Amino acid sequence: MDRKMKIKIVVVTFFLLLFIGAGSYFFTSLNTRGKAAGINLFSLVPSDCSAIFETNDLASLLRELKGKSYGKELTTHGFSLIAKDLIDHFEELTASAPSGLSLRMNKLLISFHSPGTEMDQVLYFPINPGDEKWIEEQIQKKRPIDFPLKSVLYKGKKINICPMGGDLFLCYYKSSGFVAVSYSKRLIEQVIDAHISGNSVLTDKVFGFAKDTKTANGIASLYVKEKQTGWNYLNLKFDDDAINLSGITTDAETSSSFVNAIKEQSPIEPFSGNIFPSSTYYMNQLSISQIQYIAVNSAQTEYDLASYGDDVKATDIQLMYFLKGNVAGSLAGFSFCSDDSIQRPFSLLCIPMQNSMKAEADLRLFMQNRSIKTESTAGGKIQLFYTGNRSYRFYSLPPSTIFSQLSGIKDADLNTYALFYKDKLLLAPDPVSALSYINQIEKGNIIEKDSIYKKNISHVDTHFNSLLMTDLGKLALYPEYRSRLIPDFFSQHMSFFSNFILLNQLVCRDRKVYPNLIFIYKDEK
């Protein structure tokens, strides 16, 4: 971006911050007179939003972030233009604000929308009804001559548009009690629709429950909508080297929901680090006790079984039945880098067996029955592969989505190879992945020896219902291996979170599921 463009953005951003300052001033002024406008900012948020950020004290939040090692990430990565503007120019606003202007940001929302670019947000803040004229005067007084302020009507409501050069336009809509600002005219139109029709995010009963369950009075909150867990309310806490988000899930009570599957599971303990190669950058652990629920949920989200034939569906069902009868406790899905950095990463499922001999006999019987029923030689083959001086018996399974469903990898194909190694069943998309894993383990190249891993795993509860740990920077390098178990909101903003390690735990207590996300900053200087 050239210097002229940056100057233009600073000027228009200054208007935005003046609006916010004015909003805080008038809100404070209104309190002293005894009655505020009472606008519920959530009633303006379009119902299709993916996340909502809320703070009642932006000034304190920015001061706290300024002292954190990861604070600079907010301005150096394309997370949100609106958020970046607020952070970049807050001190400038403080120095230039009119005398007596309150800088305590009392109520502020930012809603996030698809497709998740840095312009797909809307900022909302309250103002005192009747003081819109003051805001207009500030705009006219500070507006550069070469930036004519435009306006258009949408359903009888005026949208003000300020061209910022290039393809950037700052749009805002003001009405009695509030102002909404965005770099997207489309989103401002959706705000108007929600305001007129009343069809806002508050009409979502699950979101309403999430909002009602808010108990913490932290400096900021985040409401995140996920396909697997519904609306999550998360309270934000900022440590020196980590961002902590903890709260509660509010998924609807449906028999096939992921959250309700977790409610039926017994807590599990984390696997030892000696089963993961030292180059592992992604791992997840799930209980197998309610594997049918997990499979149904996965099928209904990213990897829709409806696009496959009856043979694939039948194979999935029978493999799930086989696993439930043989698995001991929980399973782990993980991805690790090869010794050759040029090669793609490898992904596997590692599943402890109750009795490996019985499990292998059951798998042979399953493959034999599938071949007879389908009258096909596709899959169902036994092959020998060698590594070093040892041979390993691989079972080439019939086409199935089982690997994708349980590993969480979005783009996994239907080929799955099974191998019994020690007391575990390994499932992989190809024999090379499994053999590479065995080579790493046999050489003693395990993550248990890594000091950073030990530090990160120390944040994990001793008992949980599911766990995901990943280096988001490495995960971003291989989008085809992106996991559906990463919350959508954070996947959409991977450029910001790429300098963090993510720990995502779900813990069930008294049939309520509590998510705990920890973003550990990787200060690699």
Regions found by a protein language model. Name each.
Residues 1-8, 524-525:
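Short, Lys/Arg-enriched, disordered terminal segments
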Residues 6-12, 16-161, 207-227, 244-346, ...:
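Structural boundary/hinge residues at secondary-structure and domain interfaces
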Residues 73-106, 143-248, 261, 265-273, ...:
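An internal, short helix-loop-strand segment that often contains or flanks glycine-aspartate motifs
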Residues 248-253, 518-525:
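Short beta-strand-to-coil "C-cap" segments at the C-terminal boundary of structured domains/repeats
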Residues 285-288, 351-353, 428-430, 441, ...:
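Active-site proximal loops enriched in glycine and acidic residues that flank catalytic Cys/His/Asp
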Residues 498-522:
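C-terminal regions of mature proteins
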Residues 126, 184, 346-347, 351-355, ...:
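Extracellular/lumenal glycan-associated surfaces
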Residues 38, 442-443, 525:
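Exposed, polar/acidic Ser/Thr-rich sequence context and nearby capping/turn residues
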